[in-house]
Amino acid sequence: MDFPLGVDISAYQYSSDGKRKPNFDIINAKCEFVAVRAGISWGYQDKWFQYSWQHLTVPRMAYHVIYPEESAVNQMQHFLNIVRPTDTDRLVLDVELDHGQTKTKITDTLIKCLEYVREHTGLSNVAEAI
C-alpha cells in the first residue's frame, strides 16, 4: 500500500538566524501535503509559520499544539488569529502533551477546542493528532 508523502515543518527546520531554510521548491515538487506548526497554547506563534505557509503550493495543514490545562477558547482564538484558514486549508489540533492532566481533562479540552474551531470557521474537517 502506498501512502502519500508529507512533511512537518516548524521553526526546528530553520536555523536560529534564518539563513538555513527548508527548500520549498523541492518540498512542493516531492510532497503531496505539508503540515506546518502555527503555534502552541494561547501565547506562542511559530516565528516561521507565515513564511512556510506562504511558500507552499501543495495541500497544507496548519497544526496547533494544545495544552490541556489551558483555556480552550484562548488557545483556539490564538490559533485562528495566526492561520485565518481558507476552505481548502486543513486544521489539525496536536494533543500529544498531557502535562499531567487526566484523560477526562484532555478530552474535555479537545472537545471544546473542536467546537470552537467548527463554530468560528464553519470547517467540519478539523483533525486531531495524538
State what each model feature region is.
Residues 128-130:
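Acidic carboxylate-rich catalytic motifs and surrounding loops in phosphoryl-/glycosyl-chemistry enzymes
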Residues 2-123:
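Substrate-binding cleft of extracellular glycoside hydrolase catalytic domains
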